[in-house]
UniProtKB/Swiss-Prot annotation:
Main localisation: membrane
Subcellular locations according to the entry: Membrane
Keyword line: Heme, Iron, Membrane, Metal-binding, Monooxygenase, Oxidoreductase, Plant defense, Transmembrane, Transmembrane helix
Residue positions binding heme: C464
Cofactor(s) required, per the database record: heme
Organism, scientific name: Zea mays
Top-level division of the source organism's lineage: Eukaryota
Cellular component terms per the entry's GO annotation: membrane
Family listed: Belongs to the cytochrome P450 family.
Entry protein name: Dimethylnonatriene synthase
Membrane topology: Single-pass membrane protein
Length: 531
């Protein structure tokens, strides 16, 4: 009894000390913040700030949009220990991503970035500096240049045919198929063939390949804007109370095993080619990166960044994870919207019949003439951006934005979801699926970062470098699915019954997978074609 009483007193004393410390910290923080002219926003609680508002029933992007509706398009809130500024309108995004891009284009330290990208050696999480500039240049001139993307056009066409064959096989029984499962398999093979080569593209169906795919799914599900509280409250990060770091390390070890095998295989193939006296020709992005890595070791200037072996792995991981997830998720959302809006499906089908005809599949050369398909893709990206909150930016220095202070060290979030549904930018039914809004003069509204009302790939220095490849994958995917099959919902399921709930991780997938019946509508021999 005496021991229990002593423990109770000790716990009460510890709680009192904690409350006093929080009060002291909050008071000191309040005095410092009075010297700043911060954007309007909610006050928040000690220690956690406004993190609680993002942990409720609403997904973070929707919760932040609701707060911005009360406090304004440029909003300040404290998330844990950090000042956070949120841009929720096209004008606010323009200020963050263009006007003040130089000061706000850095990245904050994150456990996911440090662990899974080999100590910030990729492109997504890497802070600004010589290495990031080198990686960005490689993406623009080597990995995702127009010439490189064009060189893999046949690969993309072959995987579209493989997707059609798989769906054709399911059509015989008139059974509903899980759309994302089929599309994700095709995009995985597509990206693997481009990134790591033909030999490794079949690993999707192997036990090791399946484990790799599951680990990617787990990483995407676990890595969201506020999924790891330790990112926002540093002492909780040190304790790893959610086990987030342990999970990331486990996934990293699995991925590293996979990438190391790929690199060793490529190096051996290159060695054999050189030993036989033949000229080695790069056939995939690993070949390109290994060659660039070797060349970077010969640089004489100490100021120039090198591309280490782990950097090759980190860049390949960014390509595989980003390319697979974003394309598959967007195609599934597009098909869900078309199934919920039969009139839009009919318009897309009519356009394909007119432009392509019934004697062949859609080729990438057809895409510039498929204006309605382009509008469907843009409208899908507007309503369902894969990353509704762009990857967080970081203020490297104190900056004044629209007359408000953004303190050095602040996190800066761009709510692409809120911007894309802002009545100020989209006055005509902003929550409705209307591809027609992107036809005519509005067709000039693009997704490549120049139009701040539509930012699925970001803008400025941190724009996604693979946006052109992503658009080709999604547009060709949607076009071929609609062209090759007449789609309908399963018996007993009405359009209004199709759930549009979101599951938020690093990407925003459908919470309920889309099931639909695909009935072939082209000549039978086309479904057995490989080219």
């Amino acid at each position: 009894m005496e021991l229990a009483s002593t423990m109770s007193v000790a716990m009460a004393l510890a709680a009192a000390i904690f409350v006093v410390l929080c009060s002291v910290v909050a008071s000191a923080r309040g005095r410092r913040e009075k010297a700043l002219k911060l954007p309007p926003g909610p006050r928040g609680w000690p220690v956690l700030g406004s993190l609680g508002a993002l942990a409720g029933a609403l997904p973070p992007h929707r919760a932040l949009a609701a707060l911005a509706a009360r406090h304004g398009p440029l909003m300040h809130l404290r998330l844990g220990s950090y000042h956070t500024v949120v841009a929720s309108s096209a004008d606010a995004a323009r200020l963050v991503l263009r006007t003040h891009d130089s000061a706000l284009a850095d990245r904050p330290d994150t456990a996911a970035g440090e662990i899974t990208s080999y100590g910030y050696l990729g492109i997504v999480h890497t802070p600004r500096g010589a290495y990031w500039r080198m990686a960005r240049r490689l993406c623009a001139t080597e990995l995702f240049s127009a010439r490189r993307v064009e060189s893999f056009q046949d690969v993309r066409a072959q995987e579209m045919r493989a997707l059609a064959r798989g769906l054709f096989g399911c059509a015989a029984g008139r059974r509903a198929v899980a759309v994302r499962e089929h599309v994700a398999g095709a995009t995985m093979r597509n990206i693997l063939r481009m990134a790591v080569g033909e030999k490794w593209s079949g690993c999707y169906g192997s036990p090791e390949g399946e484990a790799f795919r599951r680990s990617l799914d787990e990483a995407f599900a676990a890595t969201g804007a506020v999924s790891n509280v330790g990112e926002w409250v540093p002492w909780l990060g040190w304790l790893d109370v959610q086990g987030f770091k342990r999970k990331m390390k486990r996934l990293h070890d699995l991925h590293d095993h996979f990438y190391e095998k790929i690199l060793v295989d490529h190096e051996e193939r290159r060695r054999l080619a050189q030993a036989s006296g033949g000229e080695f020709v790069a056939t995939d992005l690993v070949d390109v990166l290994l060659q660039l890595s070797e060349e970077s070791t010969k640089l004489e200037s100490e100021s120039e960044a090198r591309l280490p072996r782990d950097g090759v792995k980190a860049l390949i991981q960014d390509i595989i994870a980003g390319g697979t997830e974003s394309s598959a998720v967007t195609i599934e959302w597009a098909m869900a919207e078309l199934l919920r809006h039969p009139e839009a499906m009919a318009k897309a089908t009519d356009e394909l019949d007119r432009v392509v005809g019934s004697g062949r599949w859609v080729a990438e050369r057809d895409l510039p003439e498929l204006h309605y398909i382009d509008a469907v893709v843009k409208e899908t990206l507007r309503l369902h951006p894969v990353g509704p909150l762009l990857v967080p930016h970081y203020a490297r220095e104190r900056t004044v934005v629209a007359g408000y202070d953004v303190p050095a060290g602040a996190r800066v979030l761009v709510n692409a979801w809120a911007i894309a549904r802002d009545p100020a930018s989209w006055p005509d039914a902003p929550d409705a699926f209307q591809p027609e809004r992107f036809l005519g003069a509005a067709a000039a509204v693009d997704v490549r970062g120049a139009h701040f009302e539509l930012l699925p790939f970001g803008s400025g220095r941190r724009i996604c470098p693979a946006y052109d490849l992503a658009m080709k994958l999604v547009a060709a995917g949607v076009a071929n699915l609609v062209h090759g099959f007449a789609w309908r919902l399963p018996d007993g399921v009405a359009a209004e019954d199709v759930s549009m709930e979101e599951h938020v991780g690093l990407s925003t997938r459908r919470k309920v997978p889309l099931f639909a019946v695909a009935e072939p509508r082209l000549p039978v021999h086309l479904y057995s074609a490989t080219e």
